[in-house]
Amino acid sequence: MSNLRKTHPIMKIINHTFIDLPAPSNISAWWNFGSLLGICLIMQILTGLFLAMHYTADTTTAFSSVAHICRDVNYGWLIRNLHANGASMFFMCLFLHIGRGIYYGSYLYKETWNIGVILLLTVMATAFVGYVLPWGQMSFWGATVITNLLSAIPYIGATLVEWIWGGFSVDKATLTRFFAFHFILPFIITALVLVHLLFLHETGSNNPSGINPDSDKIPFHPYYTIKDALGLMFMLFILLLLTLFTPDMLSDPDNFSPANPLNTPPHIKPEWYFLFAYAILRSIPNKLGGVLALLASILILLAMPLLHTSNQRSMMFRPISQTLFWILTANLLILTWIGGQPVEEPYIIIGQVASISYFLLIIVLMPMAGLFENFMLKPKW
């Protein structure tokens, strides 16, 4: 009798994806984040589903329904805090996953990379609409400020904003539709993840050396299942540490006050994972320019394959590119810090310098470093 794992139509797909998948023998812990992101997504969908059972998407009861979840629902506090901090873990893994892709040249698998960028945008949209749901001060004003950015679009901007709001301000209609979006988007993300994996398995995984690994492959199970399980233990440890000891460390104190359209918080800022983009948005005094820079800061990832000038795929043996990569990482950390600071000197100028540096590094310096490294590696005799 033939093995069911290799013959059954559904088991066969699972087998080719997680068990008998040929994987490079030298992929490091940086390749763990794909599976961690998958687990984060499952966890967010499950905790979100249980939250949705008790949440009411109405401006008069939304805030108190979240309080009710934390006070009266069995383990509601745990589900809510796992969901909120799970989003932070999701973005942490996402940023590390993208960083790995840039460092090791994974973006040269263009279809996989492009679907990945679409996934990033979808996850960001999901997180944004989700942040509005508790209907606290920062939820309300964050929604007002970010949706208002669309009014910078010439001619149709104002109409577009009112269309998204469902009225003349962020109100009941906005909250209801944002809840609908927040519920449907994770399932769209799941579908996109399957497409992402489909394209990845067309080519196989990249590896730290950037050299074609076809001559040296090992089965995914048991080697990488056990390795991914170790990564999962680490991630769950950090998540539980956050959730059980400092559940509100990454949230804004203003969001513990119910939304009040008559009282603006002193500093409107998004969650930490959007601060880098928010800093770029704020660093340009012009509204439309800021919105375009905000979009460009994410969409520039789509240009990564076009900006690759090196003869080598990975940065593993390219010290100049490595240096620029870590400068870019530090630059993003500076932008994240600036995004959380008030709009005053010296933060304004630091934000502007960091924003210019961000685009300069990706568009000019890193491609130039690739060309210079090619030149240095040419035989001189």
From Swiss-Prot:
Residues reported in the UniProt entry to bind a ubiquinone: H201
Annotated effect of mutating V353A: In strain: Isolate CD11
Outcome when changing A158T: In strain: Isolate CD11
Binding residues for heme b b562: H83, H182
Any one GO molecular function term: metal ion binding
CDD domains found in the cross-reference section: cytochrome_b_C, Cytochrome_b_N
Effect ascribed to mutating A229V: In strain: Isolate CD11
Pfam families listed in its UniProt record: Cytochrom_B_C, Cytochrome_B
Keyword Nucleotide-binding among record annotations: no
Signal peptide interval: none
Gene Ontology cellular component annotations, sorted alphabetically: mitochondrial inner membrane; respiratory chain complex III
Residues given in the record as heme b b566 binding sites: H97, H196
Transmembrane segments: 33-53, 77-98, 113-133, 178-198, 226-246, 288-308, 320-340, 347-367
Subunit structure as annotated in this protein's UniProt entry: The cytochrome bc1 complex contains 11 subunits: 3 respiratory subunits (MT-CYB, CYC1 and UQCRFS1), 2 core proteins (UQCRC1 and UQCRC2) and 6 low-molecular weight proteins (UQCRH/QCR6, UQCRB/QCR7, UQCRQ/QCR8, UQCR10/QCR9, UQCR11/QCR10 and a cleavage product of UQCRFS1). This cytochrome bc1 complex then forms a dimer.
Function description: Component of the ubiquinol-cytochrome c reductase complex (complex III or cytochrome b-c1 complex) that is part of the mitochondrial respiratory chain. The b-c1 complex mediates electron transfer from ubiquinol to cytochrome c. Contributes to the generation of a proton gradient across the mitochondrial membrane that is then used for ATP synthesis.
Protein name: Cytochrome b
Annotated organism of origin: Trichosurus caninus (Mountain brushtail possum)
